[in-house]
Amino acid sequence: MKEATKYIHAGAEPDPSTGAIMTPIYQTSTYVQEAPGKNKGYEYARSQNPTRTALEKAFAEIENAKYGLAFSSGVAATDAVIKLLAPGDEVVCGNDMYGGTYRLFTKVFEKFGIKFIYVDTTNISSISKAITGKTKLVWLETPTNPLMNITDIAAVAAITKPENILLAVDNTFASPYLQNPIDLGADIVMHSVTKYLGGHSDVIQGSLMMNSLELRDKLYFIQKSCGAVPGPMDCFLVLRGIKTLHVRMKAHCENGAKIAHWLRKHPKIGKVFWPGFEDHPGYTIAKKQMRDFGGMLSFVLKNDSVEEAMRVLSSTKLFSLAESLGGVESLINHPASMTHASIPKEERIKNGLTDSLIRLSVGIEDADDLIDDLATAIG
């Protein structure tokens, strides 16, 4: 089945009682049972909800997985994965990850005896060297947020599989339209569904996809026991958003490429971080494991001035200064003070995330209008 067809029909079945083509919003907290223990597959909405069931089926289908689980946020989905571990276990992860993930790892889970080892995951040997007998999980972002670094998922899977180490990939920046980590050997795929899957900046949600039934059952137990589940209205909004994923992502990619190339030629721009440049260190891998290069990019001004960066951030009109990404509207962001503020400055600087870095989530407006907006702001 072609991608466009898959996204439109994923998780979709006409409502058996009415024939409604769209999954109904089952806005209920509980379900009537015929007798104790005798129900119609649903007993309490924290455990199951028909709208969520349809969405979880869609999640699996769009990532070429067997199972999907929906969570109340991307961080909640990440939280569930780490709860598979025990005190003394170790996790190898990237040194330029999303700030919210870093905060969860360092401020929440380290005190429970789980050790997180941060390495440059673009260097596969760095991952190999960091693995010990206590390593239970490798956590990847690719492309990374916000420096757009690329990690070879298949190469990492070749290391983790023989050692029975779980490989989880945060696929938020790519979306299933561009990359399917399970096809490349990942055990778990995580999405901040808030971003491209929702696509309209109107829902907070996360997801996990996997092929292993044993892994699915463990994660479902955590999902239902800890209760970080989305409501049916949120599930409905994401079901609707997924139907246009292919149309939106094509436009994101086209606009992203135009803006990346325009920025690179601008005399006031120092460096542009975007994996579609042929001289990007991860270009060859990105071309192999991704279908296109996406609508996310970052840049620094040539003078590397924090003051000038702040002026640009406050001067755009079409690019809204805001957290998040992946919506139809374009956003501009200052990672050092916004999405990655929880990472200590010395760690950020060491890993290349400077105070002057600007991140763009390129929307699906007319590319020329977006370029005009940036041109005016940059000056």
Language model segments and positions:
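Short hydrophobic/aromatic beta-strand micro-patches
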Residues: 209, 298-300, 361-363
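Positively charged, small/polar-rich N-terminal and surface patches that mediate targeting and assembly
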Residues: 2-4, 10, 228, 271, ...
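Conserved small-domain helix->loop->beta segment predominantly found in fold-type I
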Residues: 257-317, 321-326, 343-349
